[in-house]
Regions:
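Short hydrophobic/aromatic patches at helix-to-coil boundaries
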Residues: 199-200
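Histidine-centered active-site/metal-ligand motif
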Residues: 6
C-alpha cells in the first residue's frame, strides 16, 4: 500500500526518483508513496515538486529515525511534515532497542549490540547521555507500572506531528508490550521530564 524511497541519493537526480514514485502510483503498484531519511529541505523540495503538477503522485509520508535518544527530526523534518500536511512515521522509536533497558547492565549476548553486523548500529546509543535517558525511562516506567518499552513508545506516539511508529518484534512478549503501549497515556509531568532529560 505504501512505497517509500529509502534515502536521498546524491548520485540520482531527484526528478528520476520522483518519476519512479509516479510510475508506481499511477500503475496501481502503490496506493501511496513517501520518502525516508530525507532532511527537512530535501523533504520540502520533493513534496513541493510533486505538488506543482496535479498528475504527479503526492508524497503522503516521510519516515525518519525518532526516539527519546534521537530527536533531531524536531529541528526540520517534523516541522516540514506538519507544515506541508504529510504523515510522519518514526522508525526505531525504541532507540535501536536501547530504550527497552536491555543494555543497562551491559550488552546481552543475544542482542543486536553483540552482533558483529549490528554492533555499530547500536553503539552510538550506549553513551553517557543515552544512559541518563534510559535511566529516566526506567524510573518513569517503575513509577507508572509500565515497562520501559511501553513508556518509550507512548512518548513517540504522542509527540506532536507523529502519525505512527514503525516497530518490530522478535518475540510474543515484545509484541504484547508494543500493543499494550497503545492503551497507556503518559502524564504530562512525565512527558515534560522525559523531554528535559532527552533535549540536546
Amino acid at each position: 500500500d505504501l512505497w517509500q524511497v529509502h534515502t536521498w541519493d546524491d548520485e540520482t537526480p531527484l526528478d528520476d526518483t520522483l518519476t519512479a514514485l509516479d510510475t508506481a502510483f499511477q500503475s496501481g503498484r502503490a496506493r501511496y508513496v513517501g520518502i525516508s531519511n530525507y532532511s527537512g529541505w530535501q523533504s520540502a523540495r520533493a513534496i513541493t515538486k510533486q505538488e506543482l503538477v496535479a498528475t504527479k503522485a503526492p508524497i503522503a509520508t516521510t519516515q525518519n529515525e525518532y526516539s527519546l535518544l534521537n530527536r533531531e527530526v524536531e529541528n526540520e523534518v517534523l516541522p516540514c511534515s506538519k507544515a506541508l500536511n504529510i504523515g510522519f512515521l518514526a522508525w526505531s522509536p525504541l532507540g535501536r532497542g536501547v530504550l527497552t533497558g536491555k543494555y543497562r547492565l551491559g550488552t546481552p549476548s543475544d542482542s543486536r549490540g553483540a552482533s558483529p553486523h549490528f554492533a555499530g548500529f547500536v553503539e552510538p546509543y550506549l553513551d553517557e547521555r543515552s544512559n541518563r535517558i534510559v535511566e529516566a525511562v526506567q524510573v518513569a516506567a517503575d513509577g507508572l507500572g509500565y515497562s520501559p518499552l511501553e513508556v518509550a513508545l507512548a512518548w513517540v506516539r504522542d509527540a506532536s506531528g507523529v502519525t505512527s511508529a514503525i516497530v518490530g518484534a522478535r518475540t510474543g512478549a515484545q509484541l504484547r508490550g508494543i500493543l499494550r503501549s497503545e492503551e497507556i497515556t503518559l502524564p504530562q509531568v512525565v512527558r515534560d521530564a522525559l523531554n528535559d532529560v532527552s533535549s540536546y
